[in-house]
């Protein structure tokens, strides 16, 4: 039996209206529709409109359109109801078809129509049509309608026509926060974040209070330009206005502090959040990774898993980046196991992080397998493979990948050639390096960067051709930076040209007056040359400026745990065994005729003390732990935050020969693969 019974004619319209309002299923609505037809009311636009709105409430867009199309003379209100339903259900092209039907039938346009149609133009990528509607809006007398004009403003902003958008903005009376947001979005979409921030400040000065959505958007603009001052001004404004900081606002604040390197503040905001979603955790983890806090990034990732949150692509990438920084290969591979491998192979963002991790852990053979398995590749992935192969000594293979890039129709960029040139530097391939360097501008019409010049200086310096290297620096179209001068300094070390090294270090000190390492190296050059007074002057200058040498840290991963060492570090539980192992190795090296190279320690330290300090540099302690904790034949992988000193480099070669172990050390410049008494860098780094 039907639940719908339409009574006498005098009250049936009112009762149908009531039945429509209380209908709780689509079947109820269909029964009402049947009753309308039976009582010849299916052309009553008022009742049909009520029924249509109710069907749209249940997202029955096809049935709604059926009701509409069977109405003999649909009016503008019926059109507006269906247009509103279509827009809310993301049927933007269908919305535009309805609008064209309105125009075809010559119906009077309602102020409610334009905002919806203009929104559909934006979402259907029909902005040209939206701009064309501007004259119609004016013609129909809606040029003072805030909703219609704000929708037009969104069209102009989204099209990048910001001058026109601003003119329109100035014409709108009683601008609401929605109007300001529309113009603001245009600036951010066009990458003009600084102007967007200034617009927000102007809005606040005019007494318009932003909503939380706007706050998130302006904080995101601050993130893009690294504007911490404006970000903190916004936070202060929110506190003065007693605005609540929801999770979106707080997460964006975490992102801002992380972008600006203020990790303590980022963590403070993070810890203050009662509820954190995966986006918040990922933001904090990536912040640690990008600000050189890899241990904290890994710890937070593990804590996130304890909260039963499934990692997303951003948290995984942050975790892998942290593992890459520490050379924590086993830990990284454990993290990979948390995500389906197919997802890595189809997600370019994650695949890039995975290849980068393998490359930085000295396991590029595994990274290259990932690269080969990927069906789709872009220039970022190609560059990751080229750079990873080159830095791990597989230079010819990196050239082959470059050839594959061209065959796939992928255009190389500056990073592509940077990877290729790094490979040429590490392998000493001068002619190949010159070929790639010239191809950057002559073949591919790309602009050479200071990093490209730095590689060429490094290449000449490696060959001992310091005159060519220095000439290239003088001919550079831009001012040489610390990378370029540092490359020349490496060449000076190779040929022991202390005079040029002194000149280079003075340039480095001028560029990086805060870098204590440059002062230390200059002091050591003076001391080696017997220029004690000048060496003392440099040290006095350091003391007056309160400068201290950056401590050298080394890390080694064993069974998923990262162990950290400083020079002369005795904090490790196995310190006694570590030092005993180094003592045994030292005795064997002395029997082989090895004498420590004490020039790598400050000159004002006694010779015996110099040898003791050198003997316990952080990388030696890490290697010793690896030797006593792993099986014979297992590769030992160590990461150091600074350049490996000359003495440690010689010691590593001898240890690899004595123990018959492969030792891979990644310093802040390159990989060193020590095997059977030799290093892959050929003693140039």
UniProtKB/Swiss-Prot annotation:
It comes from the Eukaryota. Residues 591-685 are annotated as: Type DYW motif. Residues 560-590 are annotated as: Type E(+) motif. Residues 484-559 are annotated as: Type E motif. Pfam families: DYW_deaminase, E_motif, Eplus_motif, PPR, PPR_2. Keywords: Repeat. GO terms for molecular function: RNA binding; zinc ion binding. PPR repeats lie at residues 75-109, 110-144, 145-175, 176-210, 211-245, 246-276, 277-311, 312-346, 347-381, 383-412, 413-443, 449-479. One of its GO terms (biological process) is RNA modification. Belongs to the PPR family. PCMP-H subfamily. This is Putative pentatricopeptide repeat-containing protein At3g08820. It comes from Arabidopsis thaliana.
């Amino acid at each position: 039996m039907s639940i719908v019974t339409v009574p006498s004619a005098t009250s049936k319209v009112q009762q149908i209206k009531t039945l429509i309002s209380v209908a709780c299923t689509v079947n109820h609505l269909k029964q009402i529709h049947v009753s309308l037809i039976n009582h010849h009311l299916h052309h009553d636009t008022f009742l049909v409109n009520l029924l249509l709105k109710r069907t749209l409430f249940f997202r029955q867009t096809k049935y709604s359109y059926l009701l509409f199309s069977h109405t003999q003379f649909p009016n503008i209100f019926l059109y507006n109801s269906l247009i509103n339903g279509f827009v809310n259900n993301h049927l933007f092209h269908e919305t535009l078809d309805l609008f064209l039907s309105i125009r075809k039938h010559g119906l009077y346009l309602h102020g409610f129509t334009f905002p919806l149609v203009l929104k559909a133009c934006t979402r259907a990528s029909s902005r040209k049509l939206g701009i064309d509607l501007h004259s119609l809006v004016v013609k129909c007398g809606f040029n003072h309608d805030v909703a219609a004009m704000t929708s037009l403003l969104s069209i102009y902003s989204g099209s990048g026509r910001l001058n026109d958008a601003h003119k329109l903005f100035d014409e709108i009376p009683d601008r609401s926060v929605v109007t300001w947001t529309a113009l603001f979005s245009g600036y951010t979409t066009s990458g003009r974040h600084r102007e967007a921030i200034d617009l927000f400040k102007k809005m606040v000065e005019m007494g318009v209070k932003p909503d939380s959505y706007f706050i998130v958007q302006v904080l995101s603009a601050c993130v893009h330009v690294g504007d911490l001052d404006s970000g903190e001004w916004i936070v202060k404004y929110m506190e003065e206005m007693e605005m609540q900081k929801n999770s979106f606002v707080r997460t964006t604040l975490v992102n801002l502090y992380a972008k600006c390197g203020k990790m303590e503040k980022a963590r403070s905001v993070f810890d203050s959040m009662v509820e954190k979603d995966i986006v918040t955790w990922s933001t904090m983890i990536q912040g640690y990774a990008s600000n050189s806090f890899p241990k904290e990034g890994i710890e937070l990732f593990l804590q996130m898993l304890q909260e039963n949150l499934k990692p997303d692509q951003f948290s995984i990438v942050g975790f892998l980046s942290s593992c890459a920084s520490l050379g924590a290969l086993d830990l990284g591979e454990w993290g990979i196991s948390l995500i389906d491998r197919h997802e890595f192979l189809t997600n370019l963002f994650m695949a890039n992080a995975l290849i980068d991790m393998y490359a930085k852990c000295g396991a590029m053979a595994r990274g290259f397998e990932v690269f080969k398995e990927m069906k789709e590749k872009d220039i970022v992935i190609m560059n990751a493979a080229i750079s990873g192969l080159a830095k791990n000594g597989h230079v010819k293979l990196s050239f082959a990948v470059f050839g594959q890039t061209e065959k796939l129709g992928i255009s190389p960029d500056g990073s592509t050639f940077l990877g290729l040139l790094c490979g040429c530097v590490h392998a000493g391939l001068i002619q190949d390096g010159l070929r790639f360097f010239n191809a950057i501008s002559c073949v591919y019409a790309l602009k050479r960067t200071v990093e490209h010049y730095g590689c060429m200086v490094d290449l000449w310096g490696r060959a001992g051709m310091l005159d060519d290297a220095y000439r290239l620096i003088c001919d550079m179209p831009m001012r040489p930076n610390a990378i370029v001068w540092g490359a020349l300094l490496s060449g000076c070390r190779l040929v022991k040209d202390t005079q040029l090294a002194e000149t280079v270090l003075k340039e480095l000190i001028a560029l990086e007056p805060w870098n204590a390492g440059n002062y230390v190296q200059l002091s050591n050059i003076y001391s080696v040359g017997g220029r004690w007074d000048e060496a003392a002057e440099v040290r006095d200058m350091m003391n007056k400026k309160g400068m201290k040498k950056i401590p050298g840290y080394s890390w080694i991963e064993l069974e998923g745990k990262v162990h950290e060492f400083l020079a002369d570090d005795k904090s490790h539980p196995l310190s006694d065994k570590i030092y005993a192992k180094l003592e045994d190795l030292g005795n064997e090296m002395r029997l082989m005729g090895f004498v420590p190279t004490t020039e790598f320690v400050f000159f004002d330290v006694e010779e015996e003390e110099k040898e003791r300090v050198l003997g316990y540099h952080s990388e030696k302690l890490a290697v010793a732990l690896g030797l006593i904790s792993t099986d014979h034949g297992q590769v030992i992988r160590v990461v150091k935050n600074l350049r490996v000193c000359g003495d440690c480099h010689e010691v590593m070669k001898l240890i690899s020969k004595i123990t018959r172990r492969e030792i891979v050390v990644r310093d802040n410049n390159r990989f060193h693969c020590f095997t059977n008494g030799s290093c892959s860098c050929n003693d140039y780094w």
